[in-house]
Amino acid sequence: MSNLKEQVQAVVELIENGYALPGMGVHEYLEDVLEIGYQISGDKRYLGARLLVAFGGPNIWVDTRTQTVEGYWWGEKFEVYYHTDELGLHEACEELASSLFDCV
C-alpha cells in the first residue's frame, strides 16, 4: 500500500501547493488528465468535477466537490482530503464546465 499512498499524497501536495514546474499551471495539468466528469445540478449550477489523473496502476481520481484524492490498486483503496486548492483546479474545471454546459 505504501506506493499507492505515496502516489496519492503526491497528487494532494500538487493541489495544495500549486504546480511545481516553472511556467506550468492548472491548464497544463488539465491537458494531461485522462477523464473529467462534471457534477452539475438540475438548475445548471456547477458543483464540482471528478478527474482521472492516473490509470493502470494505480488509478487515481480527484474529486473537487468533496476535495478528495482517491487511489485504487487491485483491492486496496487510499483516500485523502485536501484542504487548499492552490493549483486552482476547482475554478479551472468550473470555467470549463461553464463553457461546455452554460452553467451559472
Can you name each region flagged by the protein language model?
Residues L4-N17, G57, V62, L89-A92, ...:
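A broad "ordered helical/assembly scaffold" signature
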Residues M1-V53:
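Negatively charged, low-complexity tracts enriched in Asp/Glu with abundant Ser/Thr
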Residues Y46-E79:
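Acidic, low-complexity, intrinsically disordered interaction modules
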Residues Q67-V104:
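Polybasic, proline/glycine-rich intrinsically disordered low-complexity segments
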